[in-house]
């Protein structure tokens, strides 16, 4: 429990932090990696270079400072971050390292005096304990389930298949021959890459792209321009290759009542978590609407698979948008609409009181979808989204 004095001091520093901007977290990361270079094996250095991680941490620090007297308002963010941390196998000792560099950063940038530093130390300690306890719960839950494990487990790539021009699926089975822990449709898998071509260990999270299977996991990865790990997986990971995986995690998952209509919306490789959901809804008691947007037929992943699912399950419906169809893309067969997704095409579904909407794709696409949902009166608590990479609010 934080003292009133600590709460007041931390809240009073919030405007100063906001004014400083991501310069605060840039200084923090530079300091931490200089003194603790081993942490480069944990953090995604690509997100450091493009500034996404600095921005995400800055937003989190400002949110904590502003809501320190209303911690329940942060529970959603805590859950999201705790799941991501569990995929990175974050430990309690690492929270101490981060805390020491955060306090040193505040001191070096602002020289606020010992009272402010003590207040931030107390506030950080409380927040760190919340994360440590929640992450321990996640670790124990994964370990205690059938097929579960804690830490890393070695898997072998047993199948590699291209789903479109840029998206490739990878199926992994455990080397020990055992079963694998179940997951909730929409969650992701942590993959650890150690290769001499990389200066540091590279860790990435990729959405599981199929329904639950007892002995394997499937991820489907888009080759990103300049993407170190995605290109490595496409070009160098072959059937028979071994990788180490962390157990499934993530707070974005299918959680709809059996009688609630479900709408799954995706763009590009954002279909990976929603495809896992679709495959898991074959026995659902209410209509399921699949909406997917992509550039054209060449980039349309899982086209035949989804078409077959829709044809064999009467409660499934599919609408596809191509942004720039090729000359051989057939409207009415390959896709139904061109241009940007217009949710008014399913307005009747979205007007149902208990509808649940799940969407994933580029941030701009998700902002566009969220805007339409709000304009159509869909309550915020009934739509759910996933950002690939550091979280952004849409």
From Swiss-Prot:
Co-factor remark: Binds 1 heme b (iron(II)-protoporphyrin IX) group per subunit.
Active site: 95, 135
Annotated Pfam families: FAD_binding_6, Globin, NAD_binding_1
Enzyme class: oxidoreductase
Binding positions for FAD per the UniProt entry: 188, 204-207, 387-390
GO BP: cellular response to nitrosative stress; nitric oxide catabolic process; response to toxic substance
Binding, NADP(+): 268-273
Domain of life: Bacteria
Site keyed Influences the redox potential of the prosthetic heme and FAD groups: positions: 84, 386
Domain FAD-binding FR-type span(s) in chain numbering: 150-255
Region (Reductase): 147-394
Involved in heme-bound ligand stabilization and O-O bond activation, annotated site positions: 29
Job description of the protein: Is involved in NO detoxification in an aerobic process, termed nitric oxide dioxygenase (NOD) reaction that utilizes O(2) and NAD(P)H to convert NO to nitrate, which protects the bacterium from various noxious nitrogen compounds. Therefore, plays a central role in the inducible response to nitrosative stress.
Protein family according to the UniProt entry: Belongs to the globin family. Two-domain flavohemoproteins subfamily.
HAMAP family from the UniProt entry: Hmp (MF_01252)
Protein name per UniProt: Flavohemoprotein
Organism phylogeny: Bacteria, Pseudomonadati, Pseudomonadota, Gammaproteobacteria, Vibrionales
Name of the gene: hmp
